[in-house]
Amino acid sequence: MCGIAGFVSLDGAPADASVLEAMTDMVRHRGPDDRHTLLLSLRGSAADVALGFQRLAILDRSTRARQPMLSPDGSVALLLNGEVYDAFDARAELERDGYRFRTSTDTEVVLALYERLGLERMLQRLDGMFALVIADTRRGVVHLIRDRIGIKPLYWVQCGRTVLFASEAKAFLAHPAFRAEIDPEQVDELLAFRYIAGEATLLRGVRQVGPGHRLTIAADGFAETRYWSIPDDTEKLRLSREDAVDRLDHLLCRSVRSHVRSDVNLGCQLSGGVDSSLVTLRARAQRADVDAFSIVFNEPRFSEERWIRTAAATAGVASHQFVFDEAGFMGALDAASWHMDQPIGHPNSLALWLLAERSRAHAPVLLAGEGADELFGGYGRFAAAISGTPSSAPHDPVDAFIRATAFHSETRLAKLRPAADLGPAIEKRRAIFQEGRSDHLSNCLRYEMRTHLVDLLLRQDKMTMAHAVESRVPFLEQHIVDLARALPAEHLVGAASPAGVPVTKVVVKALARRSFDEAFVHRRKSAFNLPLAQYFRSKAFVTMMEDRLLPGMRSRGLVDVEVVRRWWRRALSAHPTTEGFWVLVALELWAQQFVDGRRAAHLNSV
């Protein structure tokens, strides 16, 4: 895992090496083990491409493996952030064909595949989590490529005749042509849903390369192309429950086997939930040196410590538990906001930030259970979608499902922002939903993969890479994705249990029942919430609100500050609007850092 930064001059203007160094500085936390920059020319004259790389050395820690990595003739430079898990199968094939490798990295395998197969055939071969930059001077192009699911981030923005790109948008702050401004068209969606679906961001003009997309930059412009789509027309498998569980078990074991490959210590991010517990079990079966790392809370209602201990004991791993409290919350607020690159929609991101900070000394690589809920139907709203549970509003099923994930209705949002208009955001999300061409449940799951999951993966990347910890997600391996898309509904969600708990993620829980008891597997799902009301009452937070956040909100003019005050009072009593209030805090924190340039001295300075 690493940090990428760079830019391309579309008009051939020479690249400024000092600007590249400054941009690369902004992502140095992602890769403290090595740093390398490279200037090259797409047109054979002035150096018009700038490539910067901060390396976190996980495989082949030698200097031979440094990036940017050049092809044998020096005409192609490649940057890879992430891991390609099937690279070693491809390596064996290439070696049989006579290719001689200089390193043991997946980066060199990807470079060889590009040279041998070309871009399109190479992309069809890659299974992993990655952001790729390929500068091909023979063809006069630069390719920006993101993995199929969107596990690793890659941002870009055009500033005049220069295209900037980076693993984190904060790198753009170091380029003199970039001006950080809020895009007003994205604010309503952020406040309602806590994140912005699709490729747009809250920074005007800044976009993400979409999951399964590539952006090709040439002298005459650039174009984005989708090279992979979530499987949609898959014929549903006719499997018994046991056969479905067996198949998932086989694929998860195989995926974890490829995910534990590392030349440094590796651990598991264990929440105590079913998904991370299964990953921990399978990881321990592959490596004896795997430990588990978890966050627990002083407040018993929010802590999963009982289930964490059960999972760790069952897997036979050492359990490291870190307490997250009011001091941890206040201590992480500014730093986590800075590293997130966007307003922190999920307040539990702060706990993940602390987990990565504390676990770094033990394990620079962590396996997580992220993705299983979105693939296999782990949320109650999926059960509602298949059962036809009526919405509280008279909307069609698509509209009802989309709005069910919003934290603020249009009525509530209008109180905060009288001119608010959720229409464009709803229509954009509807268009994403309607890309699906299957049954309603399958389309709901596809929509979650294209929206909510991508946002969760950004959180996973940014909070762990803030401390140079590589997060890996075995449930999102390609064969598991294909299986999930091919399973019929009865293996995903079912009717509520006698206790009134929706039966979700059926096949995953059936697999878990082979190792854990009924109480562990079928307890009501925990959302890993924080005791926010308690933190909001703290003296330190009250001072921050009164002295810094409310004045900032008032001068920014995005929201009605008197409404914010009322919501704050409700949030102090753990009112259901607590997390709705949180996003207002997150927005102002982020805006002060990225737009106003008000950052603590210990954060990256430009």
State the predicted function of each range.
Residues L266-D275, E299-P300, P347-L350, L375, ...:
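Glycine-rich loop motifs involved in handling phospho/adenylate chemistry
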Residues E305-R306, L333-D334, G377-F382, Y535:
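Short aromatic-enriched loop/helix-cap "lid" or pocket-rim segments at secondary-structure transitions
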Residues F376-F401:
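A mobile, often basic/glycine-rich helix-loop segment
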Residues M1-M340, L352, A356, R513-R514, ...:
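Cysteine-centered catalytic environments shared across enzyme families
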Residues A336-W338, G380-S387, A601-H602:
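Short secondary-structure boundary/capping segments
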